[in-house]
Swiss-Prot record:
Molecular-function annotations in GO: DNA binding; DNA-directed RNA polymerase activity; ribonucleoside binding
HAMAP family xref list: RNApol_bact_RpoB (MF_01321)
Biological-process GO terms, alphabetical: DNA-templated transcription
CDD domains: RNA_pol_B_RPB2 (cd00653)
Name assigned to this protein: DNA-directed RNA polymerase subunit beta
Name of a matching Pfam family: RNA_pol_Rpb2_45
Keywords: DNA-directed RNA polymerase, Nucleotidyltransferase, Transcription, Transferase
InterPro entries: DNA-dir_RNA_pol_bsu_ext_1_sf, DNA-dir_RNA_pol_bsu_external_1, DNA-dir_RNA_pol_su2, DNA-dir_RNAP_su2_dom, DNA-dir_RNAP_su2_hyb_sf, RNA_pol_bsu_bac, RNA_pol_bsu_CS, RNA_pol_bsu_protrusion
Quaternary structure annotation from Swiss-Prot or TrEMBL: The RNAP catalytic core consists of 2 alpha, 1 beta, 1 beta' and 1 omega subunit. When a sigma factor is associated with the core the holoenzyme is formed, which can initiate transcription.
Family, per entry: Belongs to the RNA polymerase beta chain family.
Source organism of the structure: Magnetococcus marinus (strain ATCC BAA-1437 / JCM 17883 / MC-1)
Assigned GO CC terms: DNA-directed RNA polymerase complex
Role: DNA-dependent RNA polymerase catalyzes the transcription of DNA into RNA using the four ribonucleoside triphosphates as substrates.
EC number(s) given by UniProt: 2.7.7.6
Length: 1360
């Protein structure tokens, strides 16, 4: 495979030994494919499947009125164009959505009262607007009210039937009580369970239990039918004085009988009493032709009658299921009945559970059973047979009320061995009988119960399906209202629009996207956190579990997770195991089950055919691991191979293997597969490592890891933060905000031959980090479709770059790295190595209040001129102003109510005028802890109101920018068209042209000096080319028209004003960029779960340094490694050092190359990239490309050590050796303070360190006075509320122990909730007096009031 554009700039040296069979699938396809399935975009209406939005409409409609004379039918639906594009929605706080219009048909019927037939009287068809459907962006997110959100996929229990037991916990004897549960997609749950007496009961929706036979009778089965369905029948007959039973050899096999078996004629004893019946005995029975076996009468007594037995008159005298007694046998003999059918129940392989349940059941017929079920479901309502029948039918057999779903039917069929059609999604009688059958067999010891945590029993509901369920809820809410409107009004005058109220529909959609537990604010800290959020699987949410109820089994790793769900990446804390991540190669199939890819193995040799298997399919195969040596690679030592089969590990010979893993990283998620040497880390630390990579803040200067895993480029590409080329071509124009690629011309094509890519510049992410895109290409460079042409945040040359490569020493340093603290060099701060930019958004609204409108103004009461220096005439801060805490960003005044004025105030008003007193200053000020530069201001004014000067100015700038963009895009398209037209005309004969004779050929020189306007006057001889030129011109006109319309639409939206929340007149948003340098208290981490807090920034000259004078950047504590068992960081240190050393070698070679020494650079590259694929690609590069790559590699050769297939010890040693570094990975360091060498050699190398989003600036907080709680009058808590520090119970004990009585008193009174005391102490401080007097704390008053609320009369007696 040829190198991509970015690989030609910088190629990773790969230490992996296993080549990949298939590429990693698109990492956000989980979201995108599900949403496409929901809308079925791009599918013709006639070819749409009955799923998604279309399927919901089909399932709810047609709706009939109560009389059955009017029906509303669904015809089709169409989505309109979104009103605002993605960027506009983000800026204006709008939802990115498209209007949904549905065509409905209202049919009015005439009924012939005599014949009862219906004829159509009238049909009215109409498009009805149902509301807005949010659309998914190209990156798999939704823009809801201006914020980017992700709908997380939900893991839930698959519909179908599940068999289980209580593990002996219910009953004291430890007996296993078996149960079964039929779970539909929607509808009533049906449970079957045994009680401790071994009777079988059924429950509907977890209500009171009923004997299972009541349910079977309600289905129309008689006692005889029930027994016949679940039991085999034995026949006894009386021959003379001896009872005989029909011989069934299978039933006798292995049994010991209490009596001997004797041949009836010869009297030969075939089996002795108390001896086991063997296969030899059975063979002898067949040889002797014994069909009947003589038995004693005792064997018959205690059996159960299989069928009803009637007397001569036809009256039933013995009912099916009755126990046979001696009297009954005598009665039958007296009645001349010589043959009797009994149930085969031997108490060992078949138990009498169902027969005993039948005996317990008081109901005798179907009607009684139905009424019993009705009473249980609707207690207190008078039952009738018809109502009971309707209720029972609606519970399980009506498709409107009960839906197993296709998945449920599939699972039902496979578990019960049925062949019911998949479109039959209600319960069938066979399903219920099949469930009871398997339950009885389980009780008899046949078969196994299901494992609820098996991924064959859990499925994923992605965006499309979750949205489909919400749409159904909305339509069902509308259904009742539609039916009532159709019934009440005059049907003749109705049109579809009249009967529909779309409010419930749009409310449900809005509620789902806005407040559902699964609709989450996207984690946009860095590209990895975005991807992980979209690939997340949650077991929580509506219809899922709750944290409190989830036990260990649900959270645990299950063998079926292999290749489907990552065993490493899950949150720490209460959600552990409930929130998971999809594995790298996993995909979700149409039924919602997770599939993993496997490579086929035929006769011991792997072939290039890859199949995706679900957890259920996988169990039937023997699967080898990715590193198994099969086929040509196998040696004699590989006669037995480690495999997986039926959830267990085993060894097998190569010829028995069916499949092989496609890659070693298919078991883990994206985040875990970014950790090099993952195989050398403890799982707990790997979990922390994968979680902390998602918290890494994008830095100003990005740096891809020297030690990577090879999938950094995949993450960068699929995350959507980079820009990829749509078509192959040559870069025509590049600046900071736009890239223009001139696409390769396809013969005969008239489409515009340019692609224009606009870059995002310094915009704010959800987590306040900075999103900025930077071009990677230069003019004239060639790019291929799919190449990365611009970097985004946390990416470098098309690879994920979350942190920086820094030189680390593992050694203690004066206690500054005690307990995971980190000592860093001043260089990291001075050179902005870990500096990041954060953009904070502050907004203020001017509302219409009862006392009048608030006003955004520069004219505020009691504010000095100095505070207004950065505000413009409208009272809004200038862009570019440096601001610090307390500065006014937007001036605002609010009217206040009239109050009684003191004489002094009256005097002041008389002197200084009215304005100052009737308004108060409610300006937006910068909160503590934020200081930076204003980078953007946006003013939104309510539609219809006059805009202020600043808003007009912003609009003018925006329009000027839009006009400039439109002109530039038009110029680019016209220039490209002009070039193509000139190329087509070159050398062609003309009929007429300015300055040419008919028949002359157009020359290049004529084209060079002719302006574009002359080309329009040229008439060519060749009509086909003329037509092609006209096509190109037509496309240019169309493109120009499209650009003009887009420009006009955007201008119109700007001038129109904004849709603001009710009561808001104006809204101003101010964006402030804050530069955050590294400082003590910031949290840093590596990729192996090695985290710590910066304790000290050490001067460069004090840091330990190497013999060549290079000081280390970071000193880490070596004690952080052994107990944590994350040795991966040490291996990374060694390999990182070697990679950096190789960079020095390339730097030397580059210097030699510049001096004109031929081939030295190429030889150096050949030494580094020594595996076959890479060396072939390097050999194909030109000298210029090689020099270009060398410039990027001189600071270190990036390596890839894929998870579970990475560099081994010998690789690292050999690389250290090649780089001219000690193979021990240790070196003599010198103390920067004393200049003396340390006693021992120290492990030194390059580690990839991340700066995490836990910055001390966001956490540090101080308060002197601030807000108080309304009820208790105690200070609020937390930085967000500007709260105080809690002085809790234990802190009180500490002060009591010290005997600090006065300190304690002020803590519990004036500093907390003594309202009067607070005021007094303020006054006394003002007077210069430092004494205070404590009053009654407000919390005491609260206690008194609470006691009074309990009707206890508590009064306060004062000792005066």
């Amino acid at each position: 495979m040829a190198l991509t554009f970015t690989e030609k700039k910088r190629l990773r040296k790969n230490f992996g030994r296993i080549s990949s069979i298939i590429d990693i699938p698109n990492l956000i396809s989980v979201q995108k494919e599900s949403f496409v399935r929901f809308l079925q975009t791009g599918t013709e209406f006639e070819k749409m499947k009955d799923t998604g939005l279309h399927g919901v409409f089909l399932s709810v409609f047609p709706i009939h009125d109560y009389a059955g004379t009017v029906s509303l039918e669904y015809v089709s639906y169409a989505l309109g164009e979104p009103k605002y594009d993605v960027d506009e929605c983000l800026q204006r706080g709008m939802t990115f959505s498209a209007p949904l219009k549905v065509a409905f048909r209202l049919v009015i019927w005439d009924e012939n009262e005599e014949t009862g037939t219906k004829t159509v009287r009238e049909i009215k068809e109409q498009d009805v607007y149902l509301g807005e459907i949010p659309l998914m962006t190209n990156t798999g997110t939704f823009i809801i009210n201006g914020t980017e959100r992700v709908i997380v996929s939900q893991m839930h229990r698959s519909p179908g039937v599940f068999f289980d037991h209580d593990r002996g916990k219910t009953h004291s004897s430890g007996k296993l009580l078996f149960s079964a549960r039929v779970i539909p997609y929607r509808g009533s749950w049906l449970d079957f369970e045994f009680d401790p007496k071994d009777l079988l009961f059924a429950r509907i929706d977890r209500r009171r239990k009923l004997p299972v036979t009541t349910l079977l009778r309600a289905m129309g089965m008689s006692s005889e039918q029930i027994l016949e369905r679940f039991y085999e029948i034995e026949t006894f007959r009386k021959e003379g004085v001896v009872w005989q039973k029909r011989m069934v050899p299978e039933r006798l096999m292995g049994n010991r009988l209490n009596y001997a078996i004797v041949h009836p004629e010869s009297g030969e004893e075939i089996v002795k009493a108390k001896k086991r019946v063997t296969a030899r005995h059975i063979k002898k029975f067949e040889e002797l032709g014994m069909d009947w076996l003589p038995v004693s009468q005792e064997e018959l007594i205690g059996s159960f009658v299989a069928r009803n037995m009637s007397d001569v008159m036809g009256e039933v005298v013995i009912e099916a299921g009755a126990e046979i007694t001696e009297e009954m046998v005598q009665y039958l003999e007296d009645g001349g009945i010589k043959e009797i059918d009994v149930l085969f129940i031997d108490g060992m392989s078949v138990g009498a559970y169902l027969r005993n349940t039948l005996a317990l059941d008081k109901n005798s017929g179907q009607d009684e059973a139905l009424i019993d079920i009705y009473r249980m479901m609707r207690p207190g309502e008078p039952p009738t047979v018809d109502a009971a029948k309707a209720l029972f039918n609606n519970l399980f057999f009506n498709s409107d009320r009960y839906d197993l779903s296709t998945v449920g039917r599939l699972k039902m069929n496979s578990r019960l061995s049925l062949n019911t059609e998949l479109h039959i999604r209600t319960l069938q009688h066979d399903d219920i009988l099949g469930v009871v059958d398997i339950l009885l067999k389980l009780k008899d010891g046949h078969g196994k119960v299901d494992d609820i945590d098996h991924l064959g029993n859990r499925r994923v509901r992605s965006v499309g399906e979750l949205l489909e369920n919400q749409v159904r809820i909305g339509l069902v809410r509308m259904e009742r209202a539609i039916r009532e409107r159709m019934s009440s009004a005059e049907a003749d005058q109705l049109v579809p629009h009249d009967v529909m109220n779309s409010k419930p529909f749009s409310a449900v959609i809005r509620e789902f996207f806005g407040s559902s537990q699964l609709s989450q604010f996207m984690d946009q800290t860095n590209p990895l956190s975005e991807i992980t959020h979209k690939r997340r699987l949650s077991a929580l949410g509506p219809g899922g579990m709750t944290r409190e109820r989830a036990g260990f089994e649900v959270r645990d790793v299950h063998p079926t997770h292999y290749g489907r769900i990552c065993p490493i990446e899950t949150p720490e804390g209460p959600n552990i195991g409930l929130i998971n991540s999809l594995s790298t190669y996993a995909r979700i199939n149409e039924f919602g089950f997770i599939e993993s890819p496997y490579r086929q193995v035929k006769e011991g040799t792997p072939i290039d055919q890859v199949d995706f298997l679900s957890a259920i399919d996988e169990e039937n195969y023997i699967i080898a691991q990715a590193n198994a040596k099969l086929g040509d690679e196998a040696s004699e030592e590989d006669a037995l191979i480690q495999c997986r089969h039926k959830l267990e590990f085993m060894v097998a010979t190569p010829d028995r293997v069916n499949y092989q893993d496609v890659s070693p990283k298919q078991t883990v998620s994206v985040a875990a597969s970014l950790i090099p040497f993952l195989e050398n880390d403890d799982a707990n630390r790997a979990l922390m490592g994968s979680n902390m990579q998602r918290q890494a803040v994008p830095l100003i200067k990005t740096d891809a890891p020297l030690v990577g895993t090879g999938i950094e480029s995949v993450v960068a590409r699929d995350s959507g933060v980079t820009i990829t080329a749509r078509r192959t071509g040559v870069v025509d124009e590049v600046d900071a905000a736009r890239i223009v690629v001139k696409a390769d011309e396809e013969p005969g094509s008239t489409e515009p031959g340019v692609d224009i890519y606009n870059l995002t510049k310094f915009s704010r992410s959800n987590q306040n980090t900075c999103i900025n895109q930077v071009p990677l290409v230069k003019n004239g460079e060639r790019v291929t479709a799919g190449d990365i042409i611009a970097d985004g945040p946390s990416t470098q040359i098309g690879e994920l770059a979350l942190g920086r490569n820094v030189l680390v020493a593992f050694m203690p340093w004066n206690g500054y790295n005690f307990e995971d603290s980190i000592l860093i060099s001043e260089r990291l701060v001075a050179e902005d190595v870990f500096t990041s930019i954060h953009i904070d958004e502050f907004e203020v609204m001017a509302r219409d209040t009862k006392l009048g409108a608030e006003e955004i103004t520069r004219d505020m009461p009691n504010v000095g001129e100095d505070a207004l220096r950065n505000l413009d005439e409208s009272g809004i801060i200038y862009v570019g102003a440096e601001v610090k805490p307390g500065d006014i960003l937007v001036g605002k005044v609010t009217p206040k109510g009239e109050t009684q004025l003191t004489p002094e105030e009256k005097l002041l008003r008389a002197i200084f005028g009215e304005k100052a007193s009737d308004v108060r200053d409610t300006s937006l000020r910068l909160p503590p802890g934020v200081a930076g530069t204003v980078v953007d201001v946006r003013v939104f004014s309510r539609r219809g109101l006059e805009k202020d000067d600043r808003a007009k100015l912003i609009d003018q700038d925006e329009i000027a920018l839009l006009r400039k963009d439109m002109a530039a895009e038009r110029r680019i398209i016209e220039r490209d068209a002009d070039e193509r037209i000139r190329n087509l005309m070159n050398g062609k004969p003309v009929r007429s042209a300015p300055g040419l004779q008919p028949g002359d050929h157009i020359s290049q020189s004529w084209l060079d000096k002719s302006p574009s306007s002359h080309l329009r006057d040229v008439v060519l001889d060749d009509d086909a080319i003329t037509q092609q030129i006209e096509g190109i011109r037509h496309h240019v006109e169309k493109a120009a028209d499209r650009l003009k319309k887009r420009f006009e639409s955007k201008v119109e939206k700007l001038e129109r004003g904004d849709d603001l929340p009710p009561g808001v007149l104006k809204m101003v948003k101010v964006y402030i960029a804050v530069k955050r340098k590294l400082q003590p208290g910031d949290k840093m981490a590596g990729r192996h779960g090695n985290k710590g807090v910066i304790s000290k920034i050490n001067p460069l000259e004090d840091m330990p340094y190497m013999a060549n004078g290079t000081p280390v950047d970071i000193v880490l504590n070596p004690l952080g490694v052994p107990s944590r068992m994350n040795v991966g960081q040490i291996l990374e240190t060694h390999l990182g050092w070697a990679a950096r050393g190789m960079g020095f070698k390339i730097e030397e070679a580059l210097k030699q190359h510049r001096k004109g020494v031929a081939d030295v650079l190429r030889r150096q590259f050949e030494e580094i990239y020594d595996n076959t694929r890479e060396s072939a690609e390097i050999a194909a590069l030109s000298d210029d490309q090689l020099v270009d790559m060398a410039k990027n590699l001189q600071y270190g050769v990036p390596t890839a050590t894929p998870v579970f297939d990475g560099a081994i010890e010998s690789d690292i040693s050999s690389w250290l050796n090649k780089a001219g570094l000690p193979t021990s990975g240790q070196i003599q360091l010198i103390d920067g303070r004393t200049g003396e060498p340390f006693d021992r050699h120290v492990t030194v190398g390059y580690i990839y360190m991340l700066k995490l989003h836990h910055l001390v600036d966001d956490k540090i907080h101080a308060r002197s006075i601030g807000p108080y709680s309304l009820v208790t009058q105690q200070p609020l808590g937390g930085k967000a509320q500007f709260g105080g520090q809690r002085f809790g119970e234990m802190e009180v004990w500490a002060l009591e122990a010290y005997g600090a009585a006065y300190t304690l008193q002020e803590m519990l009174t004036v500093k907390s909730d003594d309202v009067a005391g607070r005021t007094k102490i303020y006054e006394s401080i003002v007077k210069g007096d430092d004494t205070f007097e404590a009053g009654v704390p407000e919390s005491f008053n609260v206690l008194v009031k609470e006691l009074q609320a309990l009707a206890l009369d508590v009064t306060l007696q004062r000792d005066d």
